[in-house]
Structure formats: structure tokens, C-alpha cells
A protein has these predicted regions:
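C-terminal motif of bacterial Sec signal peptides marking the signal peptidase cleavage site
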Residues: 14-16
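Sec-dependent signal peptide recognition
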Residues: 2-8
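Short, conserved micro-motifs composed of acidic
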Residues: 22-333
């Protein structure tokens, strides 16, 4: 009997290996810093269609400074979030896999520091792993030692609150920017915290030039000379806004143009480590040409199922565009 079960185990393992090998063989060979994708111009394009941007709900973008790893997030139908990674090994990008530190609890918003030593993210994981998932988001980080990510740790010193604290982004000098709903107004505001060694000082809320509506999903430039963030409730509309820092005075935020804000539901801004490309997430839908075909229930069901196999069907996809588009806003600030 024991030999029988050992044989079954060997067969199962062999089948699993065959499946993994088949998936690897079917996955396209992707090389270069940006997953082998053709560089975009000044018109946003879907990033890595049917590889990263699929019929699922993808958000966030995060490359390591040496372009050996790429991270993004997926929102599952049950509203659970998971961080996915791709690694550059043997001169090619591997297929997407759930990141080694994610998958058990809701995780999102990955950001890697310029030196590549820290990966920040948000999570609903409890500090006590015997407890259930938290209701609010907190900011965590994970260090890299000898090429391997270590155990996640929750940020301290007042960074996290009893409300959602999300979308960490860090400047070149180590200042942390993030969004929080801690003041209890049902809005989120942008806070920043200067670094003190490997820790952070108490966070400071940015003034009303920036805050006052609903602000979240911040990207701070390495030199802190501009900031892009998501906002709701402004008279200009919803979506992504940009502001510039002039001698420690932030300009009035301007809504980015319709080439970026295609639907008003654009978020998760990020600029690549080399500064070449601007990434963001959008729920833009590309409508097919209308026809007079008589719909049947079967056709409706087929189209609905098919919508989960293709990007640009309204479920959030990742876009990218040449970062020179940001300079255009700078000139008109």
C-alpha cells in the first residue's frame, strides 16, 4: 500500500512538472528592460497586452532599479488583492507568478526604493498571524539581503493609523509620501514623512493647496520637483492631477489631459526607474463597431465570458506613455 501511494505521488509530481514546463514553453520570449514591448510615444498604450494587461483587473506598476524584477497587482473577483511578480532570469522574463511574500492576505501598491534595498507595499495582513485579515490597509516593507526578499515588517512611528494608509512612494532623499483617511472626514489626504535612518518621523499632512478633496495614489518624483496623484470631487473632474514644486511651494494641481484621463477613473501613477516612461491604470473601454446582429442569450453569455480574456474591457488595465508628456505640463505650470 505504501508503494502504491509513493507511485501516485511521483505521478502527480511528474504531471505538475510537465504542466509547468509546458506553460514555460508556451510563454513568449520577452527580453529587454520593458518586457520586450515596443516603446510608446506621447499617446498612452496598453502595457504588455495579454501578458500583464489581460481580461483580469490589473493595477500598479513597479520595476526594480536594475530591471531584474517587475511587480504589479491583481484585484480578484472577491475584492482580494494580490501582488504578482515577473523575474528576469537567463536573459528572458519569466511568466507572472504570485510574489513570494503575497497571496495569503490582501496586498497591493508595490514600490521599490532607488537603491533596490526596500520594497514598500500595503496590506491587510495582521501582525499576529493567528488573527484574521484586517479591515483597513497598512503600509509594510520588505528588505532585500543577498538578492533575496526577507520577512515583511509593518511601518511604525505613527505612519499607520486605524484608517486606510495606502500607496507609499519615496523620494531620492528618502521622504515617504502616502495617502490616509485618518482625519475621519471620509476623504483621503496626502501626508509625507522624512526619513530618520531606516525609520520615519511622524507624518505631516500637506496643506490645502494639495489636499481638501479626495487625494490618493501618489507618485513623488525622485527630486520631489513634481507629484502626480489621483483626486475626486474637484471642479475640473476626477482622475490624475499633477503639481510642481517651486522652491518648496507646490503649484495648484492641474488635471492631466484627456489623453491620460480617458475615463476619469485613472489611478496608480508611476514613472519608471530610468525616468523614461509614465505608467498608470485605467478602466478605459475600447468599443467595437456597432452592428445590427440580433442578440441571443447564448451570444450575450459568450461575449461576457470573452471579456475576461482581453484587455480594455473596463476591468482596469495598465497603460504606459513617454514621460516627455510630463514636461508638457511643466512648461504650462
Amino acid at each position: 500500500m505504501t508503494k502504491f501511494w509513493i507511485l501516485i505521488l511521483i505521478l502527480v509530481m511528474a504531471t505538475g512538472c510537465d504542466t509547468d514546463q509546458q506553460e514555460k514553453e508556451n510563454f513568449p520570449i520577452l527580453t529587454g528592460k520593458y518586457l520586450g514591448q515596443k516603446d510608446p510615444g506621447l499617446t498612452p498604450e496598453i502595457f504588455a497586452p495579454n501578458i500583464v494587461s489581460t481580461g483580469m483587473t490589473e493595477i500598479n506598476t513597479c520595476f526594480s532599479p536594475d530591471y531584474s524584477e517587475f511587480f504589479y497587482s491583481i484585484i480578484l473577483p472577491n475584492r482580494k488583492f494580490v501582488i504578482v511578480s515577473m523575474k528576469y532570469e537567463n536573459n528572458r522574463w519569466n511568466k507572472p507568478e504570485v510574489a513570494e511574500f503575497s497571496g495569503q492576505y490582501s496586498d497591493a501598491d508595490p514600490f521599490i526604493t532607488k537603491d533596490g534595498k526596500w520594497l514598500y507595499f500595503v496590506s491587510k495582513r495582521p501582525e499576529d498571524t493567528t488573527k484574521t485579515e484586517r479591515r483597513d490597509w497598512d503600509i509594510w516593507r520588505i528588505g532585500k539581503v543577498d538578492g533575496r526578499w526577507q520577512n515583511p515588517e509593518k511601518l511604525k512611528n505613527g505612519i499607520n493609523s486605524e484608517s486606510d494608509d495606502i500607496y507609499p512612494t519615496i523620494s531620492e532623499k528618502g521622504t515617504l509620501y502616502f495617502s490616509s483617511g485618518r482625519d475621519g472626514t471620509n476623504n483621503r489626504d496626502i501626508y509625507y514623512s522624512e526619513s530618520s535612518g531606516d525609520e520615519f518621523n511622524d507624518p505631516i499632512k500637506m496643506n490645502d493647496t494639495i489636499n481638501g478633496y479626495w487625494e490618493g495614489d501618489i507618485f513623488i518624483s525622485p527630486k520631489e520637483d513634481y507629484m502626480i496623484f489621483r483626486s475626486y470631487g474637484r471642479k475640473e473632474g476626477n482622475g490624475l492631477f499633477i503639481t510642481f514644486n517651486n522652491n518648496d511651494h507646490w503649484s495648484t494641481p492641474k488635471r492631466m489631459g484627456n489623453e491620460i484621463n480617458m475615463t476619469g477613473n485613472e489611478f496608480c501613477p508611476m514613472v519608471s526607474p530610468d525616468g523614461s516612461y509614465f505608467f498608470f491604470t485605467s478602466s478605459n473601454i475600447v468599443m467595437e463597431s456597432e452592428n445590427s446582429e440580433l442578440l441571443t442569450y447564448k451570444k450575450i453569455k459568450e461575449d461576457f465570458i470573452s471579456s475576461y480574456e482581453h484587455p480594455q474591457m473596463g476591468k482596469n488595465d495598465i497603460y504606459w506613455v513617454d514621460s516627455k508628456i510630463i514636461d508638457g505640463y511643466r512648461e504650462n505650470k
